[in-house]
Amino acid sequence: MSDISKASLPKAIFLMGPTASGKTALAIELRKILPVELISVDSALIYKGMDIGTAKPNAEELLAAPHRLLDIRDPSQAYSAADFRRDALAEMADITAAGRIPLLVGGTMLYFKALLEGLSPLPSADPEVRARIEQQAAEQGWESLHRQLQEIDPVAAARIHPNDPQRLSRALEVFFISGKTLTELTQTSGDALPYQVHQFAIAPASRELLHQRIEQRFHQMLASGFEAEVRALFARGDLHTDLPSIRCVGYRQMWSYLEGEISYDEMVYRGVCATRQLAKRQITWLRGWEGVHWLDSEKPEQARDEVLQVVGAIAG
């Protein structure tokens, strides 16, 4: 698309970043200054009753800056990147029609990618193929399947952890059904986003700082009643660790503790480690992201001013 035709498109802002990087605080600050409406881009914040462990904006923050696409699913329900793209496009159109600018904030990079580039033509799930993969995993272990994926699709294998059976089996399933790798197919994009997008990523300057913030926030969640929140979900009786909601970072580890599989201290250790691993994956995505303007979490006023400098011209 030419620069002239791109300039005629409606405007949008992406505010991306790893967990615990200060995205929400910056988005709320920007809403006070710019004519923006916030849309959450987070695969955990969609779930009702999952507030503490997801660091969902609190009532005061939501009063100051309402977020769209929060609390739109029960934890028993699935929600795909395709669902997100459909819902986000509808919200963006609504915001644009009101003469305001959509500000999409979150850390689910797959959602941002699906929105920006469109969805690739991946084959639908095949229960027979999936059952065959799971049978092989039961006999040989997921490590063996991960080695198989390394031979078939080394790019996907580098991105998918051997302990992530859902994504691992999906990558193999796609290849067995289509004869093409997940990497090949995901490079075939769908409809591009019909907006002129200003993209920002916020993160601390050092990994050590991010690790500290993650550990502090996990302990704050525990002090705020995270265990009681997960106990309420656990007591429902219809939720389990095969659901995307309960596989969310922190929830999965607390669930293992409630089931008596691990000690409290082990749960805390694993929860912090899993959150750090999530942040590492998010940063890896962002480092390969084109056209992104980096902001420093430790300098919030400077970060705000940099956004205003870049997008100030579009706010009129």
UniProtKB/Swiss-Prot annotation:
Pfam families per UniProt: IPPT
EC number(s) recorded for this UniProt protein: 2.5.1.75
Keywords, in A-Z order: ATP-binding, Magnesium, Nucleotide-binding, Transferase, tRNA processing
GO biological process entries: tRNA modification
One MF term in the entry's GO annotations: ATP binding
Entry superkingdom: Bacteria
Residues reported to bind ATP: G17, P18, T19, A20, S21, G22, K23, T24
Segments for region (Interaction with substrate tRNA): 42-45, 166-170, 247-252, 280-287
Site (Interaction with substrate tRNA) residue list: T108, R130
InterPro entries, per database record: Dimethylallyltransferase, IPT, P-loop_NTPase
Reactions catalysed according to its record: adenosine(37) in tRNA + dimethylallyl diphosphate = N(6)-dimethylallyladenosine(37) in tRNA + diphosphate
Binding site for substrate: T19, A20, S21, G22, K23, T24
Cofactor: Mg(2+)
Protein family membership: Belongs to the IPP transferase family.
Quaternary structure annotation from Swiss-Prot or TrEMBL: Monomer.
Protein role: Catalyzes the transfer of a dimethylallyl group onto the adenine at position 37 in tRNAs that read codons beginning with uridine, leading to the formation of N6-(dimethylallyl)adenosine (i(6)A).
Name of protein: tRNA dimethylallyltransferase
Protein's organism: Escherichia coli (strain SMS-3-5 / SECEC)
